[in-house]
Amino acid sequence: MHSLSASEVESAVRRVWELFAAKKIDQWQSFYADIASVFGTASKRPEPARLVVLRRQREYLTSTTRVQVHVEKVDVELIGPDCAVAAYIMQLDAEQITRVSAAGQKEQEEHLENARVTHVFQRTSDGSLRIVHEHISAATI
């Protein structure tokens, strides 16, 4: 098996968000390792990816929801032959979502203009790339 490359990791990042926006749920969730942890924009602690995936599916991936994602330049640091960190800025626009705010109010849209995202990817024994950690934070100005 060959070592990871920056372009391979960048392609994986872009693919994750393409699948999310296209609501290709099975393919999108397969990018997350079983052991993955996630810090979302509203997280107070890391959560297992399987829970975050289910929540995102319920909130963002219904038939009526419209999602657009734009990923800026992806900076990749290779930290071993099978592991890399990807850091980037993205924009997310979601309409007709089913989400409850921290204040308990229903939200129907979300717009993240300059969300900061970090992914840690690891190559598995079958050669695929999996996210083992994700952190998304929204810039507050």
Enumerate the language-model features and the residues they cover.
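Short beta-strand edge/turn micro-motifs at domain boundaries
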Residues: 105-141
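Short helix-adjacent coil turns
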Residues: 16, 20-27
